[in-house]
Amino acid sequence: MRARPETVCRLEPSRAKVQRVAMKTQTVSIAREGGIAIVTYDRGGRANAMSFAIMDELAAAALSFVDDNELRCVVLTGTDRIFSAGMDLSDPVFDQINEMSLQDKRHFSERGPRLGRAWAGIEVPVICAIEGPCLAGGLALASMCDFRVASQSARFGAPEVQVAHNMGWHSVPRLIALVGVQATRRVLLAGEEWTADEARRLGFADEVCEAGGALTAARRMADRIAGYPGLAVRMIKRQIDASAHALDYATSAYDKDQQLVAWMSEDFQAARAKFVR
């Protein structure tokens, strides 16, 4: 089930320029500054990994912007040390999945693709501010955003193949659109990692800044976008997405089934066992 966010306070934009906290759960918070929403994901710990419950929280955060006509831009960020190392393979929910019926397993494996669609479907531009490692599911989530601002501390990779997992969440066609087929092959199949400068050269990162400055740079970009006519921005984003990503969901339709097959494989079980020792 989708996590129920705890609403701390909600102020109308006309009454306060800064809405201190519009939504807060244990790991995900949304702060409003006029028409800009800043979503912070901070689980604590070195990996900032995503459990299944946290994936639901992140999806709920994205869906909270539906019908928000005051919204002009969204900034998504992790901690000041790491964006995210991806899925938490030590999540005990994996053990429960083994006991589910096949239909329930397929339904459960929809969480990742649903998270990707929720962020890709936000009607206003989304800027991802990245410090430190952005790996696996972190890379997938970042690929759903419209812009990526990376600090010099950022590094990008997708070690899924090393743990016998597919690359899902509808992210493969997004990566291909951003960096091309061969760079996608290298990062997914050959274990290549990118520095911030390499990500900028390939087209994954739109801006590179000094370490610790990603959120500031992303907010500067958000301020610029928020100053443009909101309706025009929304229409142009929709035009771009319709042209660039028209077949994304068709070409990644088997994401959740591939994910399910991966979870049931002996190779994945062996790889996961190393995380839960």
Residue ranges of model-derived segments:
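Conserved CoA-thioester-binding segment of acyl-CoA-metabolizing enzymes
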Residues: L11-P13, K17-T79
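C-terminal alpha-helix plus adjacent terminal tail
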Residues: P13-G34, G191, T195-D197, G212, ...
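Terminal peptide-recognition signature
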Residues: V39, R43, E57-L58, L76, ...
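Catalytic-core regions built around general acid/base machinery
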Residues: A61, R111-I122
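Glycine- (often His-adjacent) and acidic-residue-rich active-site loop
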Residues: G78-L115, A164, L247
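Short, active-site-adjacent cap segments at secondary-structure transitions
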Residues: D80-A85, C134-A136, I240-S243
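Crotonase-fold acyl-CoA enzyme core
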Residues: R117-L231
